[in-house]
């Protein structure tokens, strides 16, 4: 037995040594390839697809809800950094969410049509985002699709849904003077050939024949299953102007899928890719994503989720995907992430309508990739290179045909130390460009001019959320000018809108969604959040007006709002119903914290949280309050002082509990979810005051410009 063990050990050592030798040999081979000069020969300028743009999503939740509340000039600066040509990211396409009242990762946005017959094209802020973006770049491609829809629509593949889209397009055109470039059938909810045909027919009949229709925006291995149906159904193939799906960087198209789509003459779009990294790793991965989307999958429009993080840090994905963090409108502070310059390496060197040059689009022998784009109207061209997977310096020679400019090329470089910095120009010699490429670096070369590393010197310093804080909603004199949305409140689900107050003159807030939406994500109570995650001891209060069968609540110590696919909160709330039942409740998030739901990234986020807490909602204290009936105003106040939590109704203590389960967190307002309906209470005179350990933070209230002109 001992001899057998020794023989086995010697054999294992020999196998390991052989494997190490093979690995070293492979590494030397790769290094040898890198030290040699790789030549990229371009002779055919006609072989290559139309470039349809790179860009980002604004949506998939209320991703920029705090951006609207920024003072000037900071609000305009942030938009410049993302959308102004040859300044910052300079994206060439934007895909926005058609708001539908439901949660779609980072909260919800109010629909233009809460109920059948409702039509309000100033509700929400997404119209403002589109207008501001296209004002900066008239060539910007405007794309859109829905994540959620109001209950009255019935189902996503109905004539009502087609009509819902058409009304939104009409409002975009008639009220805001904007024309959409393309519309998606839906986001991540399967596919329906009949719906695509129905929607295309309706768009053609109602004056939107020029708006391209793409489908179907799904993820996973089955995301292209509908392509076979397109091959067998000419009407369906004719209905779709482009074929799209998500996350080609994770699951690229197969050669067969790509060939089938190209045989039908359809462009391939990626309507949502994901790069969830930090720092320079995010920047170079974005460029790699853009390059490989075309090289491998043939995608000519690549949209990443998402652009501007105008959300509270408490919310999921509040930092890593975004280009700009804009989460302190009360101070005016914002910060630019390295990822923005990944977009700039494309955005400042190309425009929608350029053409890919296929012979200049490939993986590099020494690691990395190269994309070549040209302007078919001129002789200008650009080359974008990333060397993320390279282990050493590599030499590259690009040989160009006649028909491309012979002017010197500007060179802009990004690495881990410096992002988007201009380098010495590169001269062509008889149509040859010779380059020495450093590993883990991004390069953009172009015969175009005018690129710049845009920046602003007057960014205010960061500051905590002010406390005491109050809002009586009277200063929003024309609610439509503000999109009916108050400052600093971020709706997680539902729509908390500025409306005329019942029973007394003036304005107040109301949760306006009364039915279960066709929500992209699982529903919970409708609620909105405000404040600072560091708050410990404080009081939050609001006047509430209850319709028959309504409930309303104030919330506090909110320290978690879910992983994105589902927004179950962790914290406390004080709830009152129209018959006087008052409850102090602890909410511990999703009932089964380990349940894996949502897409791949959502499931990874759930696993990363390692949350073993028992979820659900539990009543800590309950009382019956006399004198409460529907259609009256009453005051709710929730007080935190150490582990003592007290609830008041109309200034009288009615419930009390001891709990140290959650010690700090944000405040909020809630319209509870009931079995067959959602409450639609009114709220007024929101107040948050420090108690005990929480110290006052004073701040000057900044002037904010309205979103819309209403006269």
Language-model-detected regions and their locations in the chain:
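Active-site neighborhood of glycoside hydrolase catalytic domains
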Residues: 160-182, 187-276
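N-terminal catalytic cores of secreted or lumenal carbohydrate-active enzymes
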Residues: 32-181, 185, 193-201
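Carbohydrate-binding surface patches
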Residues: 359-405
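Flexible glycan-contacting loops in extracellular carbohydrate-active proteins
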Residues: 656-688
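Aromatic/acidic polysaccharide-binding cleft in carbohydrate-active enzymes
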Residues: 270-368
């Amino acid at each position: 037995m001992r001899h057998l063990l020794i023989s086995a050990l010697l054999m294992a050592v020999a196998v390991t040594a052989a494997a190490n030798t093979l690995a070293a040999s492979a590494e030397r081979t790769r290094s040898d390839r890198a030290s040699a000069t790789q030549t990229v020969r371009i002779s055919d300028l006609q072989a290559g697809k139309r470039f349809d743009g790179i860009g980002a999503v604004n949506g998939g939740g209320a991703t920029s809800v705090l951006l609207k509340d920024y003072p000037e000039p900071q609000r305009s600066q942030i938009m410049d950094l993302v959308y102004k040509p040859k300044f910052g990211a300079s994206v060439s396409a934007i895909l926005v969410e058609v708001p539908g009242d439901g949660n779609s990762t980072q909260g919800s946005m109010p629909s233009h049509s809460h109920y059948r017959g409702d039509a309000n094209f100033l509700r929400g802020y997404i119209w403002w985002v589109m207008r501001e973006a296209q004002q900066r770049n008239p060539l910007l491609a405007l794309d859109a699709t829905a994540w959620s829809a109001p209950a009255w629509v019935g189902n996503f593949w109905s004539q009502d849904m087609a009509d819902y889209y058409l009304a939104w397009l009409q409002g975009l055109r008639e009220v805001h003077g904007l024309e959409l470039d393309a519309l998606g059938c839906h986001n991540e909810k399967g596919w329906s050939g009949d719906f695509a045909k129905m929607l295309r027919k309706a768009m053609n009949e109602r004056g939107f024949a020029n708006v391209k229709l793409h489908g179907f925006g799904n993820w996973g291995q089955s995301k292209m299953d509908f392509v076979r149906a397109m091959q067998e159904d000419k009407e369906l193939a004719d209905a779709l102007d482009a074929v799209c799906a998500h996350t080609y960087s994770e699951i690229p198209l197969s050669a067969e899928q790509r060939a089938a789509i190209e045989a039908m003459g359809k462009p391939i779009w990626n309507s949502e890719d994901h790069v969830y990294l930090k720092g320079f790793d995010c920047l170079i991965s974005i460029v790699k994503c853009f390059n490989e989307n075309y090289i491998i999958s043939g995608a000519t429009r690549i949209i990443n989720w998402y652009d501007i993080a105008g959300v509270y840090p408490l919310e999921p994905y509040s930092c890593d995907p975004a280009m700009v963090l804009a989460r302190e409108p009360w101070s005016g502070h914002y910060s630019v992430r390295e990822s923005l310059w990944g977009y700039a390496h494309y955005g400042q060197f190309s425009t929608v309508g350029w053409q890919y040059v296929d012979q200049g689009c490939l993986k590099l022998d020494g690691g990395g990739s190269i994309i070549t784009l040209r302007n078919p109207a001129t002789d200008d061209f650009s080359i974008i290179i990333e060397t993320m997977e390279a282990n050493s310096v590599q030499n590259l020679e690009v040989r160009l045909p006649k028909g491309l400019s012979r002017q010197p090329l500007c060179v802009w470089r990004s690495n881990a130390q410096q992002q988007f910095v201009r380098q010495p120009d590169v001269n062509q010699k008889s149509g040859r460009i010779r380059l020495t490429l450093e590993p883990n670096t991004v390069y953009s070369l172009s015969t175009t001019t005018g690129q710049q590393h845009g920046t602003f010197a007057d960014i205010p310093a960061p500051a905590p959320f002010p406390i005491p804080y109050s809002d009586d909603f009277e200063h929003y004199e024309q609610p439509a000018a503000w999109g009916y949305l108050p400052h600093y409140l971020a709706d997680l689900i539902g729509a908390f809108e500025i409306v005329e107050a019942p029973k007394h003159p003036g304005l107040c807030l109301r949760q306006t969604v009364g039915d279960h939406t066709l929500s992209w994500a699982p529903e919970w109570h409708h609620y909105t959040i405000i404040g600072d995650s560091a708050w410990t001891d404080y009081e939050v209060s609001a006047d509430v007006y209850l319709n028959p069968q309504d409930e309303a609540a104030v919330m506090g110590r909110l320290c978690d709002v879910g992983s994105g696919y589902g927004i179950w909160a962790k914290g406390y709330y004080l709830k009152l119903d129209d018959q006087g039942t008052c409850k102090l409740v602890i909410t511990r998030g999703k009932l089964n914290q380990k349940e894996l739901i949502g897409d791949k990234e959502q499931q990874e986020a759930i696993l990363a949280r390692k949350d073993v807490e028992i979820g659900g909602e539990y009543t800590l204290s309950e009382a019956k309050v006399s004198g409460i009936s529907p259609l009256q105003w009453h005051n709710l106040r929730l007080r935190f002082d150490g582990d003592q939590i007290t609830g008041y109704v109309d200034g009288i203590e009615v419930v009390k509990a001891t709990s140290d389960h959650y010690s700090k967190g944000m405040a909020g307002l809630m319209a509870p979810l009931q079995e067959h309906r959602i409450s639609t209470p009114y709220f007024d005179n929101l107040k948050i005051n420090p108690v005990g350990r929480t110290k006052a933070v004073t701040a000057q209230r900044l002037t904010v410009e309205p979103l819309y002109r209403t006269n």
